[in-house]
């Protein structure tokens, strides 16, 4: 189409909706207990239970916020922010509206991100060449709290 995938999806709501459904389906494949979302939010994948109360989780490029929602449901003493492009963040805001402690904000992972204690990058870095992946990680590092 002569344009990047994200630009195309930002202008084509129907295709963006299909893409969101695909990503949700991939995350939830395997059922409620074996899905990537369930595993990613569990202590089997990361020592979530060892984090301090009120830790702030930043889901970078988090789409509609499915993983963040599960993390906050499993660990209600956390708060979290899903960061994605503006059109996606609007959908995430709607999805997360009933999840305590959750919010969605528009942003780019190449720029300043919200301050947080833990950063989640699910299915992000593999989409980019090494230079861009490094830029994403540098943006995360600049945004981290002192104890992150």
Which residues are covered by each model-predicted region?
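Conserved adenosyl
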Residues: 1-148
């Amino acid at each position: 189409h002569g344009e990047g995938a994200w630009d195309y999806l930002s202008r084509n709501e129907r295709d963006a909706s299909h893409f969101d459904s695909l990503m949700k389906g991939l995350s939830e494949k395997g059922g409620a207990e074996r899905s990537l979302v369930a595993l990613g939010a569990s202590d089997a994948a990361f020592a979530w239970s060892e984090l301090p109360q009120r830790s702030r989780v930043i889901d970078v490029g988090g789409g509609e916020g499915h993983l963040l929602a599960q993390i906050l449901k499993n660990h209600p003493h956390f708060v979290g922010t899903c960061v994605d492009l503006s059109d996606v963040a609007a959908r995430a805001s709607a999805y997360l509206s009933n999840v305590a402690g959750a919010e969605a904000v528009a942003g780019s992972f190449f720029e300043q991100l919200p301050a947080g204690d833990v950063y989640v990058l699910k299915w992000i870095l593999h989409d980019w060449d090494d230079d861009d992946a490094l830029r994403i990680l540098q943006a995360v590092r600049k945004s981290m709290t002192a104890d992150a």
